[in-house]
């Protein structure tokens, strides 16, 4: 059927979305009134949305449905819970056994179908809601720190060496030039033997 109005289809209701009422997320268009968490129906925006495949969630419901399972996960400090989210209508699915991929570019393939990459620091899965990209890899926000001093980094303030990331200060101290006049500040020469 031709799309005479020229608008895109909403990712939730599949009706035409016109420019004045459009919200875009991960290449999909939504009506402002349809841009709601699929579980709790809370209004979403660019800072609160978490995407899994074609589905949109608030970060809380996303964490309950797809985050780590077990005592103490996703609740904040000092709480333990066995709530698996059934009260919110979340049904847990058994995951099928692992099948090795035959795709030579598995990470890009996994991104397109909603899979996840592994954080180089902790080796855990990195989901879109917690992803930071630096040195060509995906990291958890909490793991995106200098390997030497632990200082939080941004993609513009890091230096990488051998797959590890450092703040510019630690990188300069550990891997920068050494010898006469280096690393002492303006006007100072030091002779070390």
UniProtKB/Swiss-Prot annotation:
Transmembrane segments: none
Domain of life where this protein originates: Eukaryota
MF (Gene Ontology): actinin binding; metal ion binding; structural constituent of muscle
Chain positions of motif Nuclear localization signal: 64-69
Subcellular localization(s) per the UniProt record: Nucleus
One GO process term, biological-process aspect: sarcomere organization
Position(s), cross-link Glycyl lysine isopeptide (Lys-Gly) (interchain with G-Cter in SUMO2): 91
PTM-bearing positions, type N6-acetyllysine: 84, 112, 131, 137, 161
GO cellular component: nucleus; Z disc
Keyword match Acetylation: yes
SUPFAM superfamilies on file: Glucocorticoid receptor-like (DNA-binding domain)
Name of the protein: Cysteine and glycine-rich protein 1
Stored Pfam families: LIM (PF00412)
Record-linked PANTHER family: CYSTEINE AND GLYCINE-RICH PROTEIN 1, RHO-GTPASE-ACTIVATING PROTEIN LRG1
PTM sites of type Phosphoserine: 81, 192
Its biological purpose: Could play a role in neuronal development.
Domain LIM zinc-binding: 10-61, 119-170
Lineage of origin: Eukaryota, Metazoa, Chordata, Craniata, Vertebrata
């Amino acid at each position: 059927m031709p799309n005479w109005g020229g608008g895109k289809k909403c990712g939730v209701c599949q009706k035409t979305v016109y420019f004045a009422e459009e919200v875009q997320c991960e290449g999909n268009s939504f009506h402002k009134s349809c841009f709601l968490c699929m579980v709790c129906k809370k209004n979403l925006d660019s800072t609160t949305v978490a995407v899994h495949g074609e589905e949109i969630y608030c970060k809380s419901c996303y964490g309950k449905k797809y985050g780590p399972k077990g005592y103490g996960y996703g609740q904040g400090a000092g709480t333990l819970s066995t709530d698996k989210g059934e009260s919110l209508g979340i049904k847990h699915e058994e995951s099928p056994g692992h099948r090795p991929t035959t795709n030579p570019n598995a990470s890009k393939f996994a991104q397109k179908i909603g899979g996840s990459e592994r954080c180089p620091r902790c080796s855990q899965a990195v989901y879109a809601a917690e992803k930071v990209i630096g040195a060509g890899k995906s990291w958890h926000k909490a793991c995106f720190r200098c390997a030497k001093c632990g200082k939080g980094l941004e993609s513009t303030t890091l230096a990488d060496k051998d797959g590890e990331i450092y703040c510019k200060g630690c990188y300069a101290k550990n891997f920068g030039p050494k010898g006469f006049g280096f690393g002492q500040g303006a006007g100072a020469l030091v002779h070390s033997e």
